């Protein structure tokens, strides 16, 4: 079987980028040939797939930065809503050329295309006689809601998809309604974490301080600024704590972040090179925090659990559903009630102070548990392993 994978972004650094490469990596266990179409820039040299058809942004194919499904990306990006007709035309032309090349040269039996948006619609038109599966990452639903005119103009062919894979059951009705797609052809596939990268430490070092970790976008919609405020309150009560913030700090955000961090000596900010590096970092931390206002799934919280960390997260429906009763009712994860959310991912300003207090209180609970017993019980680690990519890939393979 010959499988072509398609993504309009970098195959790293975002949830969908990591999902994309994890699917490819997982399918290597089966007797398949694989090729990929994705966005890149001149600084990258990817070697994760046998055959690749790259679209180079800020380079030979397209002059402007990669267009991101989220308005805030962990790398330099263009917003769909800000694209001119000329930009859209050059973007479509570059991807169309690669799609046609892949069709003629690689001749796939199946195409897996990520995000229910413009590129997937093009895939449906170009691969009319090939089985095509679309993967919904939820940011595509958000784009469709925020840019309905763009959706109506450029996203017309998703009805041709053989199946749509959803990351949680909670978005199935939304997919069916927004894209007018038959609900019986939508499969709740969920996600999985890469157990080869995210696994617990063999033994835990004894540290004086409890180490708290955040990794992701430095963005309002992630509750990022409220997290810093919460930690500043926490460290006034407990001096034996540290917070590490992993991500890309953009120049325009630096003054605000530095102002909030203030004179704290217990907050470190840096970036991870890749997923392997992130996995190594996680194994030396104690608690992972995900204070986000919007997530399709929040896979990074699952990766943290797989790495043996306790987790504090907001009440993300997809995550709660995904982890299941046994993990949710254990003491290794605690959920924090969000402030009222409007416009998909914005928190009501007046409710943020109470949310910050809730973050502090929940972190205090987890810190106490960590000090009492750092290691996660074996039976819970085994339960978490049920959500690994190994299990998920078997399900995806059966759908091809």
Identify the residue ranges that each predicted region occupies.
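Acidic anion/phosphate-binding donor-loop and adjacent secondary structure
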Residues: 144-146, 184-185, 193-209
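Carbohydrate-associated surface elements
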Residues: 170, 192
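A conserved catalytic-core segment of Leloir-type glycosyltransferases
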Residues: 41-102
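A charged, aromatic-enriched C-terminal amphipathic alpha-helix characteristic of glycosyltransferases
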Residues: 15, 347-361, 365-398
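Aromatic "clamp/platform" in nucleotide-sugar-dependent glycosyltransferases that forms part
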Residues: 293
């Amino acid at each position: 079987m010959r499988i072509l994978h398609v993504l309009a972004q970098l195959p790293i650094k975002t949830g969908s980028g990591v999902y994309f490469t994890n699917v490819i990596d997982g399918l290597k266990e089966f007797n398949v040939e694989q090729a990929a179409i994705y966005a890149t820039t001149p600084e990258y040299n990817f070697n994760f797939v046998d055959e690749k058809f790259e679209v180079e942004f800020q380079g030979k194919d397209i002059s402007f930065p990669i267009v991101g499904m989220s308005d805030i990306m962990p790398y330099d990006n263009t917003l769909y809503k800000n694209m001119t007709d000329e930009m859209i035309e050059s973007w479509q032309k570059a991807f169309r050329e690669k799609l046609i090349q892949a069709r003629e040269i690689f001749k796939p039996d199946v195409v897996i295309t990520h995000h229910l948006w413009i590129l997937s619609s093009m895939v449906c038109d170009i691969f009319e006689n090939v089985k095509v599966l679309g993967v919904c990452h939820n940011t595509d639903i958000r784009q469709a809601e925020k840019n309905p005119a763009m959706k109506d103009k450029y996203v017309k062919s998703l009805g041709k998809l053989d199946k749509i894979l959803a990351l949680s059951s909670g978005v199935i009705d939304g997919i069916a309604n927004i894209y007018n797609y038959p609900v019986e052809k939508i499969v709740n596939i969920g996600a999985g974490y890469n157990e080869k990268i995210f696994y617990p430490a063999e033994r835990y070092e004894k540290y004086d301080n409890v180490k708290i970790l955040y990794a992701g976008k430095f963005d309002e919609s992630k509750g990022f600024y409220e997290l810093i405020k919460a930690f500043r309150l926490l460290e006034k009560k407990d001096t034996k704590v540290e917070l590490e913030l992993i991500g890309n700090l953009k120049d325009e955000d630096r003054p605000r972040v530095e102002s909030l961090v203030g004179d704290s000596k217990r907050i470190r900010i840096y970036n991870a090179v890749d997923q392997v590096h992130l996995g190594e970092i996680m194994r030396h931390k104690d608690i992972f925090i995900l204070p986000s206002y919007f997530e399709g799934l929040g896979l990074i919280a699952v990766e943290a659990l797989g790495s043996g960390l306790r987790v504090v997260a907001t009440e993300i429906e997809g995550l709660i559903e995904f982890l299941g009763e046994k993990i949710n009712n254990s003491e290794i994860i605690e959920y924090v009630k969000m402030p009222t959310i409007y416009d998909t991912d914005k928190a009501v300003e007046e409710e943020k102070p109470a949310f910050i207090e809730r973050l502090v209180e929940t972190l205090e609970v987890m810190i106490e548990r960590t000090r009492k017993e750092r290691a996660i019980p074996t039976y819970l680690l085994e339960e978490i392993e049920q959500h690994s990519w190994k299990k998920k890939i078997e399900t995806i393979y059966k759908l091809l």
